[in-house]
């Protein structure tokens, strides 16, 4: 009985691994996301390379991520919500373009600008 249960467990683990591998799903989640690359690809056009808005971003009301007051009063959840939903006529929503792991990883980049 023990052998049968053990073999069934191994079989399930192998099948789960195969499904994960062939579906392209990462088992490590946010751990292997290059958040800086995601930021540079999707955010820097308006928010700038260093978290200081570009001229385009300033015209759209982009946040100054290095602003200590904004950093202190803004929660990670608010940042995630903003990235997901955007702001009409100012910032496009990214919930359809980025994974939730990528969006969560962007929080660390945004927070990093407050430490510089």
Task: Tell where the protein language model's regions lie, with residue ranges.
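Short hydrophobic/aromatic-rich motifs at helix boundaries and adjacent loops
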Residues: 14, 50-53, 79
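C-terminal capping alpha-helices of c-type cytochrome domains
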Residues: 89, 96-116
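Periplasmic/extracellular electron-transfer cofactor-ligation site
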Residues: 32, 36-61, 85-90, 112-116
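Phosphate-binding glycine-rich loops and adjacent basic patches that engage nucleotide phosphates
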Residues: 2-6, 38-48, 65-73
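N-terminal export/targeting leaders of redox proteins
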Residues: 1-31, 116
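Short Fe-S-cluster ligation motifs
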Residues: 72-90
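Electron-transfer interface patches adjacent to heme c in soluble/periplasmic c-type cytochromes
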Residues: 63-77, 94-103
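Solvent-exposed, polar/charged alpha-helical surfaces in well-ordered, non-transmembrane soluble domains
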Residues: 36-37, 41-44, 77, 81, ...
